[in-house]
UniProtKB/Swiss-Prot annotation:
Ranges annotated as spanning the membrane: 5-25, 41-61, 72-92, 107-127, 135-155, 166-186
InterPro entries tied to this protein: Mntp/YtaF, Put_MntP
Membrane association type: Multi-pass membrane protein
Natural source organism: Bacillus licheniformis (strain ATCC 14580 / DSM 13 / JCM 2505 / CCUG 7422 / NBRC 12200 / NCIMB 9375 / NCTC 10341 / NRRL NRS-1264 / Gibson 46)
Molecular functions per Gene Ontology: manganese ion transmembrane transporter activity
Similarity remark: Belongs to the MntP (TC 9.B.29) family.
Entry's Gene Ontology cellular component terms: plasma membrane
One Pfam family named in its UniProt record: Mntp
Keyword rRNA processing applies: no
Top-level taxonomic group: Bacteria
Its job: Probably functions as a manganese efflux pump.
Name of this protein: Putative manganese efflux pump MntP
Record's keyword terms, sorted: Cell membrane, Ion transport, Manganese, Membrane, Transmembrane, Transmembrane helix, Transport
Subcellular location(s) of the protein: Cell membrane
């Protein structure tokens, strides 16, 4: 293979990975306002990165067998999950007991990770049809998503210290609006 072609493919996949990672950054920004500890930030970033490896790989495999209709469905499912997470965070911000219905650990982290990585499944579907290099693709998708999730979570954590009690409601509003963006053709 020509070195120029390989560099071009790496740059193209890196741009895609960055675009998909920006979803995770935006959602991480909202989730970071939920008073997370550093080990939670690390864990969330790793889990999001892993899901951005698993989902496009699954998409690439499925892309060989399925039509493009599933791509649109994945976006709607991801939007609905983010909508639910956003509403939960807004409700929890007004809940005086401090309990969260969906929290960023355990099953809540799983729901969060699936929500932000469903779009990478759709991209994987498309890339599976074009025959891109799976190892390079999933490595870049996972790396970019993990790093951008950490950046979003840490920035959200800083904003949380500035906004105090209102930060979780703001974080929920960010997730809610991002979910609506995925659900509605705006």
């Amino acid at each position: 293979m020509n070195v120029d072609v390989l560099i071009g493919e790496i740059l193209t996949l890196s741009m895609m990975a960055f675009a998909l990672g920006m979803d995770a950054f935006s959602v991480g920004l909202g989730m970071g306002m939920a008073k997370l500890k550093r080990n939670q930030v690390f864990q969330i970033g790793v889990i999001i990165g892993l899901f951005h490896v698993i989902m496009p790989l699954g998409g690439m495999i499925a892309g060989q067998f399925l039509s493009g209709a599933l791509g649109a469905l994945a976006g709607y499912i991801g939007g609905a999950l983010l909508l639910v997470l956003g509403i939960q965070m807004i409700v929890a911000s007004f809940n005086k007991s401090g309990e969260q219905i969906i929290s960023p650990h355990g099953f809540g982290l799983f729901v969060f990770a699936v929500g932000v990585s469903l779009d990478s499944f759709s991209v994987g579907l498309s890339l599976g049809l074009y025959g891109t290099k799976p190892i390079l693709t999933i490595f870049l998708f996972g790396l970019f998503s993990m790093v951008l999730t950490w950046a979003g979570l840490l920035l959200g954590k800083k904003v949380q210290t500035w906004l105090g009690a209102y930060s979780e409601a703001l974080g929920g509003a960010i997730l809610l609006s991002f979910g609506l963006k995925l659900l509605l053709p705006i």
